[in-house]
Every structure is written in structure tokens, then in C-alpha cells.
A protein has these predicted regions:
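ATP-binding N-terminal substructure of ATP-dependent carboxylate-amine bond-forming enzymes
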Residues: 1, 234, 352-355, 361-418
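ATP-dependent carboxylate activation and anion-phosphoryl transfer catalytic cores
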Residues: 1, 5, 15-17, 22-314, ...
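Short glycine-rich anion-binding loops that position phosphate/pyrophosphate groups of nucleotides
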Residues: 12-13, 142, 403-404
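Short, basic interhelical loop/turn and adjoining N-cap
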Residues: 291-300, 341-352
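Extended, domain-scale alpha-helical bundle/helix-rich regions
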Residues: 329-332, 338, 342
Length: 418
């Protein structure tokens, strides 16, 4: 009965390998055969397509008594149709109403209670913003990629707490800082966390740079900032691809608006860099939303960055920006190196001037739940540095692998544990 309409083929594999979207009988036969071959249980699911809906996730922890808490609400900025492992994500949810979040939480609790999980579970939903309909995409009753993101975003040690719950403790028996015990925990950080995937298409000759229901990312980065713009630009710099901002990537700035919009019609690893140049060439928020189904809020934030960049280049090419404009650029996440590149002045001149103005990053702690005096820190130009440094003790530096090129993502990354 679904033949003739868009369908989604899903199999029992990690990262959606073997599945895909199909649009006719021939594609249905091909993808089903591929999915059956890849599936660990010799089955595939044939489901209606919910392409373009909002993809939303909750990380829920449950104990043996049936007590439940939500550790984190995660909004996928890319719509359904792009695998969540490839999708750009934010925590907390930035455009979803409290009413919808409460609805998702109620449904997630019913699901987790029904399967009687003890520990952490990731529940993924699709939400149609037009009709309000909600469907469950999948659940992961284990420590997943999203669990790792939720843990780092909130300071809540999901794996540790899951182990404690599995040993027989309950949430109301585990101490948790200002909340007293874990059963009273609510996510309440005053910062924004973004996850951006890292791909390596350049290492696989002949592989098309196209994103869909099969995961293509080989790693990811996570950034923390006080605003979306600040966190967004920090994420781009963390990719270790010698990109210090969103503009002037590859030859996208040489292409016409029409060419860029044609490229945006198919999701790719360069989607947000193409979007940035399309906005520079005059594409409207509505045009880009129609092609990508990325919500207006996120496109508008990017448009404001484009306008700010164009204003800086027009007014200050060959010189350091005026004090107020330089400060605003730093608040919005522009790096010294990127400002140096677009303005044609030395990076040192920009850094010297902003330091003279007192425009320097402050450091703030994300406190780890359930432990005393334990935190990790993020930098922001929106805060004053009030984190004291104790130089009386020896220190240890742990180096992680960065955004992994080939190999494990954060979900399977064991190298930082020991």
C-alpha cells in the first residue's frame, strides 16, 4: 500500500548501513536486498518516510524503582533524512516549545518504563511541526553517541550512574550537588552545546559526498558557548580542517546564487558552508528553508553572521576594526585568524588591540553531577574569568584524539578512559 510514495528501509545495523530512502519499486527491491544482506537478523523494516520532520532526542535515566529523570534534551538542526550521527545538534533544544518538550518527555518515560531499562536510554523522536504528530524513530537502551554528547553537555556522568543503578542503587540514594539527590536533577545549564560531525570523504575515492539515512561521519566535535553563534563558530574551528570561519571555503564563494542553491538541494558534508555563501549571494531564509528544511531560526543566525562579516570587510579592510565592532565580532565567535584573513591585517594586530581593550575569554566550569569540586571548563567572551588557578600542585594533561578521521567516534572512544 506504500508503493508509489516515499518509503524508508531500515535494517538491524550500526549507523544505518544497508538502509535508505526509496521512491519506486526498483529502488525498493535494490535497497531491500542490500538491507537484508547487511542486517544482523535477516530482516528489514519498511516504513513510511518522515523526511523533513524535526528530529528530537531525550536522554533518560531510570532506576529499579521506576524513578526517571531526563538528563538532556537534544535538537537535531538537520531534519529527519540525515542520520543523527551526521546531523548538526544542539543541547538544549533552541526552537522547540516547552509544551512539545513535555509531551516528548511523557512519551519517553512511558517507553522506558515499558521496557524496564535500568540505566540510560536514548529515545529519538520525529515531530511534524505542522500537524504536531510525533513518532518514535528508535531507542538505544545503552550508552550511545547521544549519551556521550548528553554527558559532556550537562556534566552528568551517564555511564557511571548507569553502573551504580545496575549495582542496585536508586536515584534517590545517589547524592547530586545542589539538587540533593539525583531523582531531583533537572538540566539547567546557561550555555549552548553544539555537536558537528567530522567526515573524511576525501579519503575514499569515488564515494559521493551525500548524506542520508546511512551514517557517513567518522567522528565529531563538541563546542560550548554562551550563544549559538559563539558555539557554532567554535565548532567549525575544532574540526581541524584549517577552517577558521564559515566563509571562503573551497570555491563556494566563486559560485553563483543559483549554483549554490542547486547544491543545497542535496544534503552534503559541506552544507553549512554552502549555505553561508548562498546567504552572502542574496539567498533568502525562506529559499534555504524550503530546500534544506533547516529551521528559520538557525538560518537567520547564520545570516546575521554573514551580514556582520560583510559590514566589517566594507568598513575596515586593511585595518583593525573600531573597538565596539571588534568586541561584537569576538562576542559572536569570530576568531582572530578569520578576522585577519577577511580584513587583510595581521592576526597579531587584532589580538593586541582586543587584549588592550580587555576583550579576552573567560573560563566557566561545567560541574560534574554527583561529585564534589569537579568540573571541566569552557571559554567564552561573554563571561569574566572567575575560575581560580591553583599552581601549587602538579598537573596532568590528557590529550584526546580530536575529531577522529577514520575509526571510532566518541561513542566507541576508549583511548581517553585510561
Amino acid at each position: 500500500s506504500l508503493v508509489g510514495s516515499e518509503m524508508c528501509i531500515r535494517d538491524s545495523t550500526m549507523g544505518g548501513a544497508g538502509g535508505g530512502l526509496v521512491y519506486n519499486k526498483e529502488e525498493l527491491k535494490t535497497v531491500c536486498a542490500r538491507g537484508l544482506q547487511a542486517s544482523l537478523v535477516g530482516q528489514v523494516l519498511v516504513e513510511e518516510s518522515i523526511l523533513g520532520w524535526e528530529e528530537l532526542e531525550l536522554e533518560v535515566v531510570r532506576d529499579a524503582k521506576g524513578n526517571m529523570i531526563t538528563v538532556c534534551f537534544i535538537e537535531n538542526i538537520d531534519p529527519v533524512g540525515v542520520h543523527t550521527g551526521d546531523s548538526f545538534c544542539s543541547a538544549p533544544m533552541l526552537t522547540i516549545s516547552e509544551e512539545v518538550q513535555k509531551k516528548l518527555q511523557d512519551q519517553a518515560y512511558r517507553i522506558v518504563d515499558a521496557i524496564e531499562v535500568i540505566g540510560g536510554t536514548n529515545v529519538q523522536f520525529a515531530h511534524d511541526p505542522i500537524s504536531g504528530r510525533v513518532v518514535v524513530i528508535e531507542i538505544n537502551p545503552r550508552t550511545s553517541r547521544s549519551s556521550a554528547l548528553a554527558s559532556k553537555a550537562t556534566g552528568f556522568p551517564i555511564a557511571l550512574v548507569s553502573a551504580m543503578l545496575a549495582s542496585g542503587l536508586t536515584l534517590d540514594e545517589i547524592p547530586c550537588g545542589k539538587y540533593g539527590t539525583l531523582d531531583k536533577y533537572v538540566p539547567d545549564g546557561d550555555y549552548i552545546v553544539l555537536k558537528f560531525a567530522r567526515w573524511a570523504f576525501e579519503k575514499f575515492k569515488g564515494v559521493e559526498d551525500k548524506l542520508g539515512t546511512q551514517m557517513r561521519a567518522v567522528g565529531e566535535v563538541m563546542s560550548i558557548g554562551k550563544t549559538y553563534k559563539e558555539a557554532f563558530q567554535k565548532a567549525i574551528r575544532s574540526l581541524e580542517k584549517s577552517r577558521y570561519g564559515l566563509g571562503h571555503v573551497k570555491d563556494f564563494d566563486q559560485k553563483s546564487k543559483k549554483e549554490l542553491l542547486t547544491m543545497l538541494a542535496t544534503p552534503s558534508s559541506e552544507r553549512y558552508f554552502i549555505m553561508y555563501e548562498a546567504l552572502r549571494k542574496g539567498a533568502s531564509v525562506e529559499e534555504i528553508n524550503k530546500l534544506t528544511k533547516v529551521k528559520d531560526y538557525f538560518i537567520e543566525q547564520m545570516k546575521e553572521l554573514v551580514e556582520e562579516e560583510e559590514k566589517l570587510v566594507a568598513a575596515y579592510h586593511g585595518q583593525v576594526p573600531a573597538d565596539a565592532d571588534l568586541k561584537q565580532a569576538k562576542l559572536d565567535g569570530f576568531s582572530d585568524k578569520y578576522l585577519s584573513q577577511i580584513l587583510g591585517v595581521s592576526e597579531e594586530a587584532i589580538r593586541t588591540r582586543r587584549t588592550e581593550l580587555g576583550v579576552v575569554e573567560g573560563w566557566e566550569g561545567v560541574h560534574v553531577s554527583g561529585t564534589e569540586d569537579s568540573a571541566y571548563y569552557y571559554s567564552s567572551y561573554h563571561i569574566k574569568d572567575e575560575s581560580p588557578v591553583d599552581n601549587s600542585k602538579q598537573k596532568v594533561m590528557i590529550l584526546g584524539g580530536g575529531p577522529n578521521r577514520i575509526g571510532q567516534g566518541i561513542e566507541f572512544d576508549y583511548c581517553c578512559v585510561h
